[in-house]
Structure formats: C-alpha cells, structure tokens
C-alpha cells in the first residue's frame, strides 16, 4: 500500500484543488505583499483542465511537444506542490502562507468561509463589474479568465456537493497534511508557520459575530473530545483524491515519458532526466492503489501498465494488462474502442511473431470497424495488416482480403485527408512491385510516388514511414547493383533508430545471424551449427527464417552435402514462388542451385536455367542479375572446355560488368583462371 493511501477519483474538489484556491485567496488578499506568479498558477492548474485520452497506438508521439520542454503534471501530493512553489524567487513566503492556511483550516466551516470569501470578494462577472468595485483593496478576476474559470468551476462543484462529499474532502485533507508532516520539507518550515495570523486574515472580512464564532469553536472542541476510535461513515475515504482530468493528464504524460525514455535506451543514450525513475515509481505506487471500480472507468491505465510490463520483459503481465484494457474499453460508452482494443491485441501478438493469434485479432477488428463505420480506424487497421504481411508474407493468404485490394482501398480513400494514408498506399504498392518482380521502370515509378508524398510532409511527423522510404531506396538500388547510391541511403539509415521494441529485439537476432554467416566464411562450422540449433527454438519473422534457410544451404554446400542442399534449395524455391512471392530470395536460391551443380562437375545441367533467367531479367530490366548469370554461364563454359567462348563472352560485356563492384572480384577470378589455362595451352603446344 502506498503511504499516500488509496487513490480515489472524484468529481468534487480535491485537497490539491484546495491548495490552488488558497493560493488564489492569498494572491487576491495580498497577504504579506504576496503575488503568486502566473507561471505557478499555470503549472498547478493546467493538469486539472480537460484533456483528451492519448493512446500511443492511435496518436503520433512526434506531434506532441517534447517532454523535456513541457513540465510534467504536478502530482496531487502536498510535498510536490510545495516544491513547485519553492522554485520561485519568493517561493519561501508563498509556501509558508500555503502551509499556514492549511494548518488554520480546522473543519468544514473553515472551508466554507474560504469558498464564500473567494466568491464574494475575488470573483466578478466581467471587467465592468471590476471597475465598479472602486473601494475594494483586493485583486479580482473575471469569470472568463484563466484563474476565474478554475475558481468558478471549484465553487460550482462545492455548492452542488452534499454533506458526505464535503466530509470526504475534510477527511482526505487530514491525510494530505499528515503525509506531508513526515517529510524533510515540513521539518524545515514548521517553526515558521504562523497559524493564528492566517486565521485572522481569513476571518477579517467575514460577516460572522463573535458569539457565532465562539459557538462554532465550542462544537468543534466538543466533537474533538469524542472517542478517538469512533468510526466515521467515510473512513474508507482516507487516502489521495484526484479529479478525472488530473489523472488523465498524469497518465498521458507518463506514457509520453515512457516512450521518450525507451527511445533514449534504444539509441544507447541515458535518460536525460534524473527524476524519471523516481517520478515513474511514484505514479505507479498511486495507480496500484486505485480501486478496480475506478480502474474500469479509466482503462488507459492498463495501457500504461502494458507498456511498463513490456519494458521489464514481463510478457504475461503485459498480455493481462492488454486484455484488461480490451475488456473494460469494450464495455464503455464508445463503441469504437472495441475494435481499437482488438487492434492493440493484434499488434501485441505480431510483435512476438504469434501470427495465428494476430490474424484472428486483425480480422475481428476489421469486421467490427466496418460494422461501426469507423473509417479512420479501419484505415489504420488496413495499414497494420500490410505491415504485418510485410514482416510475415507467408501468412498473406490467410486474410480474406488481398494486398492488392487493401492498396486499392487506401488509394481510393477520398473521405480522408490524411497524407499518411496515401503515403502508406504507395509504400505498399512499391513493396508489392518489388517482391513480385515487376519491371524496374514500374518499381521506380511507385517508389518515386511514395517519396514525393512522404517528403511533402514533415518527415519527423511520421518517422517510421520516412525510415521505410529510405530502407526501400537501399533495397531498390542494391538489387540493381548501384551500391554507391544505396550506400548513401544506408549510412543515413544507420544513424536513425526506431523506437519499436520489435525492431530492437529483431536487431539482436539479426546480429546473431550476421555472426553466423561470418563464422561460415571462417569455416567455423561448430558455431554455425550452434546458431542453426538455437534458431529452431525462437519465434522468428520471415526475413530471419529465410536468412537462416540460406545459411543452412550454404553450410551444407560448404561441407559437401550436395544432395541435401539441392533438395532444400528446390523446396525453398518452390516456397518463394507459391507460398510467398519473393523474387529476391528465389534468385539467391537459384544461384545456389547453379553453384551446387558446378561443384558437382555437372554445371552443364544448369545451362537451360541460366538462359531462361537471363531472358527473364533482360525483360524486367535488372542488369546486375543479368551480369551475375552471365558470369555463371562463363563458369559452365569453362567447365565444359569452352574457355575461348567464355573469354569472348566476358570481353564483349566487360564494360557492363565493370559497372558493378559487386561482381568485380568474381570477374577477376574468372579472367585469371582463363589466363592460366591459356598459358597451359601454349606450353602444351
């Protein structure tokens, strides 16, 4: 249990509100020449104003101002309020005045007098009314002003509140003060707090007789003399009260802080705010005391718990929190939250490559979004489905809607004005044209449209989309063989980092795969076998799976197991043609099959395949792949004793071959072997 007691949500005023009201009273009364700075009121009142729920799934974090610029909401704890006051140059005087007022309030009657005095002497309807009060020595505020709006709201809440609500605020105020009196700040100031002086100031303008005041004090004394162990009807309300708006602001900020802190960690930097962990711990201590009844009315708290559990790798807790969010939102007033919750669940499953569960959630979310005619969320679901298929293309056939249909739907979404929708549409069109081996001109056209729409917007507003653009540029130019261009994009991409936890975890696995390929080059077969065995126990995405398949094939070729390697190659080529349309990996496995035949001294059997592939890539317009196949053809010719034809073939195409640094080493090896063979022929003659 938190030392601040259970957290309770209320529509009535809170001890935190009462502190602000006291500061307004002191500011208007000009006690001891006090003038509370506007910045202090802004800092304290802003979190209590209505704010929209901020869901990290639906909102773009980059559109928010940086958390390092906007100060965090003040927690409903007196220690935090006093520390905010002490940041000002006259903070000591203001803090002492606040503590004096709080100590002077000795019952509901004191709160009543404070509220009446504020309404009577500090609040006016408009500036004209203010000018009419020429005899007033107090500062005054209009109802429409920033302070006036807050004051009017609090007065209205207090007036419509019943006796039980007022008793609750009094009881919670005692706990509010008691907790503070166990802090070092209280020990620092307690000897300078002047209670009687504040009492006199508060009562100075009250129209209450001496006899009435004595009667009030008598009954207060009489009540205090009762049995100290007696129960009150609201004993369960001891703890910390908070308004719905205030709690919303705190949870919103905590989510933004979590995302910012995670991004710092993923970039290898330390969090700049030294108070992040302390503040986060305090917020979670308070939220953990929230009753289940209140939590069900405030499901966003479960998103916060979900994010925190993900950070701590507590996946079961994360899943439970997400299910709670799903359950409580689905029973709320807003129908659209039902499919938003399902979408959240789908993205969670896909993050851990639990594809079957993700697909079920995606389809259910799509169905309900259509029933509710929520086009904005439906667009978002479509984008997430394509993102899922991009990572797991082998599951594309499991959806009732095809990628082509989704792209057409997004491109024709005339009822939305969000440029990101159209950027994503052309992004997926580019992806589809790449994997389906479209002509180079068509791929280039789609990529150019994707770039034009994405760069028209500020890239920082959707950095993930901008990163996708850069990664597609890298892939496009690399497959065409122009590494000088792809390197430019790759260097830029390496300097950026996504805040996605899935990307972070995947990067670790991808690094292991790179180490395994390096071990294969160094003939460290034991390490390669260890990585291959380890990969069997992991949930991997498509790229990781296909890379490991490629590693297995190259490993088998390296150890001379040509029969098994050829069987696996044929299986993988079939998968790339039927289950997944992946021309890039199909080409790599086709090249490996040619290598196996060459190593088996039956390279001539690969001749029909080489000729067919050359014709195919000439039609598509991929010069790099044509050159790679040309060199394989030369190896076959050399193997069957047609070295002169091979040399002639290289010589005729040398200018094209030298355009691609990727194949220069192999070209040099072939020319060197041809030169050695010519020398041998000369010696024989």
UniProtKB/Swiss-Prot annotation:
Gene Ontology CC terms: anaphase-promoting complex; nucleus
UniProt keyword annotations, A-Z: Cell cycle, Cell division, Mitosis, Nucleus, Ubl conjugation pathway
Superkingdom of the source species: Eukaryota
InterPro entries: Apc5 (IPR037679), Apc5_dom (IPR026000)
Function: Component of the anaphase promoting complex/cyclosome (APC/C), a cell cycle-regulated E3 ubiquitin-protein ligase complex that controls progression through mitosis and the G1 phase of the cell cycle. The APC/C is thought to confer substrate specificity and, in the presence of ubiquitin-conjugating E2 enzymes, it catalyzes the formation of protein-ubiquitin conjugates that are subsequently degraded by the 26S proteasome.
Subunit: The APC/C is composed of at least 13 subunits that stay tightly associated throughout the cell cycle: APC1, APC2, APC4, APC5, APC9, APC11, CDC16, CDC23, CDC26, CDC27, DOC1, MND2 and SWM1. APC5 directly interacts with MND2 and SWM1.
Classification via PANTHER family: ANAPHASE-PROMOTING COMPLEX SUBUNIT 5 (PTHR12830:SF9)
Record protein name field: Anaphase-promoting complex subunit 5
Organism: Saccharomyces cerevisiae (strain ATCC 204508 / S288c) (Baker's yeast)
